[in-house]
């Protein structure tokens, strides 16, 4: 089974490119524009060298890699297959030679084509089916209760993202926040790493780790950080306090 980076806590940045307005043209670095993926084609939709939120997202992914974020989960569900593949391929290329692992949400076809890992939502492919077919693939799984957790772990997931722990607009469809006690129970029931998700901030990250979480997964914590590298340093320091 694929090995996760050996960092404490594990940090997972979940992307949300739709919340990123282009700033200053939103252009990706010239090096990226010079080496487009074959999957990008010639259309503007697939190109990562154009101005716009996708250019900003790739820049953020580069910053997250440079800062030492362990896992980057790309979940741009609104993109076409071609555009998503181009983005994931570009992210994988930038992470090559580092400890950062790139995963794509729900899209097994894109993960395999780009050489990325796969993150499975509860409504996605069964973890066991994917693990059986692809023994070496890095697989994460979203879980909202212990039954889902046990099923994902038994199926061969490498790690669990559990939540929502705290109130967050992004997770309202999943009901009220589960809270730290449910997180603690999930950690106690699992033999694989459990990452806390949902409303995680610098202010409550320590409480998640005190509940036993092996790491933290978030959108805003990383994507809207004033200084991403400093945020990562502060989160890493929590395990040494």
Where are these regions (language model features)?
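Glycine/threonine-rich flexible loop motifs
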Residues: 170-172
């Amino acid at each position: 089974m694929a090995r996760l980076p050996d960092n404490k806590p594990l940090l997972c940045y979940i992307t949300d490119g739709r919340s990123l307005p282009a700033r200053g043209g939103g252009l990706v670095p010239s090096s990226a524009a010079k080496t487009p993926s074959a999957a990008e084609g010639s259309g503007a939709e697939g190109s990562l060298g154009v101005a716009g939120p996708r250019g900003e997202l790739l820049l953020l992914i580069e910053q997250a890699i440079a800062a030492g974020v362990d896992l980057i989960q790309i979940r741009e569900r609104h993109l076409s297959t071609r555009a998503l593949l181009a983005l994931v391929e570009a992210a994988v290329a930038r992470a090559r030679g580092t400890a950062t692992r790139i995963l794509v949400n729900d899209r097994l076809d894109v993960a395999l084509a780009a050489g990325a890992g796969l993150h499975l939502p509860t409504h996605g492919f069964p973890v066991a089916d994917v693990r059986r077919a692809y023994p070496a693939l890095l697989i994460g799984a979203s879980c909202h209760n212990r039954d889902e957790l046990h099923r994902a772990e038994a199926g061969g997931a490498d790690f669990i993202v559990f939540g929502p722990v705290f109130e967050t607009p992004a997770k309202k469809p999943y009901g009220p926040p589960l809270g730290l006690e449910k997180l603690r129970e999930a950690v106690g029931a699992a033999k694989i790493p459990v990452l806390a998700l949902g409303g995680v901030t610098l202010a409550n990250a320590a409480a998640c780790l005190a509940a036993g979480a092996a790491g933290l997964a978030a959108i805003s914590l990383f994507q809207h950080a004033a200084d991403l590298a400093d945020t990562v340093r502060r989160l890493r320091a929590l395990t040494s306090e």
